[in-house]
Design a protein with these regions (language model features):
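N-terminal alpha/beta PP-like core and its mobile active-site loop of ThDP/TPP-dependent enzymes
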Residues: 1-213
């Protein structure tokens, strides 16, 4: 198993855990560093994925979708300035008690503090507005590590709904290689523990096409 396979397995575990918690809508602004997350979404059933290239537009689309359906919506982006563009939507979600998750890819620790491109301190980007910040750390091999990360993701999904709905930020750093091997991408879905679900009727999911900017 390559390190790219390990990261892809983690990304799939994250997505599967969110799905178990009732998160079915993902709004993606793709970039290189978020490759494991985007591939995980592409290989997961029973979710709705919207691609919006501009993060500011994506943020407000997600807030509107969450308000219209009552569902938690998950924003997914790459590293650097990308998650910072969500700030106006985060403020809106915080003050309107709208359940919203931000799942940001990040550069690994060794690329921070030495002028590497698209490497900024993504910890606590929204300290005044997010209900919770969770950093998942560099992906590791092994069932115990995967169980630990799924527990943190479950905690984040719950925090977006309770005690009062609002935005939650999940940050996950990835190292290169970002792509899994041919064997890794066809590996079985990771088993994740059942999580508390906050699911509206499936009919509440908006029937909209992928949005592009």
């Amino acid at each position: 198993m390559t390190f790219g396979d390990i990261q892809f397995l983690w990304a799939r575990g994250i997505v599967e855990t969110l799905l178990q918690a009732g998160v079915r809508c993902f709004v993606v602004s793709p970039g290189s560093r978020s490759t494991p997350l985007v591939l995980a979404l592409a290989t997961t059933r029973d979710i709705v994925v919207h691609k919006i290239l501009d993060e500011r537009s994506a943020g407000f689309f997600a807030v509107g979708y969450a308000k219209a359906t009552g569902q938690t919506v998950c924003l997914v982006c790459t590293s650097g300035s990308a998650p910072a563009h969500y700030l106006p939507a985060i403020v809106e979600a915080a003050h309107s008690f709208t359940p919203l998750l931000v799942l940001s890819a990040d550069r690994p620790p060794e690329l921070h503090g030495n002028a590497a491109p698209q490497s900024v301190n993504q910890a606590h980007l929204f300290p005044s507005f997010s209900r919770l910040f969770v950093d998942l750390g560099i992906p590791e091999s092994g069932d115990a590590a995967l169980r630990a990360v799924t527990r943190k993701v479950t905690q984040a999904a719950v925090a977006a709904r309770l005690p009062e709905p609002g935005p939650v930020h999940i940050n996950v750093p990835f190292r290169e290689p970002l792509e899994p091997s041919a064997i890794g991408i066809t590996s079985p879905r990771p088993a994740v523990a059942a999580a508390p679900q906050f699911v509206a009727p499936r009919s509440a999911l908006l029937d909209t096409e992928t949005v592009k900017s």
